[in-house]
Amino acid sequence: MYMNNKYEIIKSGENKGRIRALRSFGDVKKDDIGGFIESETNLSHNGDCWVFDDAKVYGNAMVFDNAKVYGNAKLSGDAEVFGNEKLIKSRI
């Protein structure tokens, strides 16, 4: 694990695991539990991007920059959320 990583994936025996913040940034505090991702390619360690609540990001989908994914939103395929975008209770 690199010193600059902002989260770790807590595997739950399925393909997707919950994320846990390793440091505070933006609206996220150290040790906050976030949503689900399939791998580190789904969520950047740079910027203030985060997957909140029960949101899921998987496949080749990516969240980066300062983008946020909330609620029970699902991001999959080759979808990207970036910049200051917010995805709330949507399926892309």
What are these model-predicted stretches?
Residues 1-48, 78, 84, 92:
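Terminal amphipathic alpha-helical/low-complexity segments used for targeting or macromolecular assembly
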Residues 44-91:
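A detector of tandem-repeat and repeat-rich interaction/domain scaffolds
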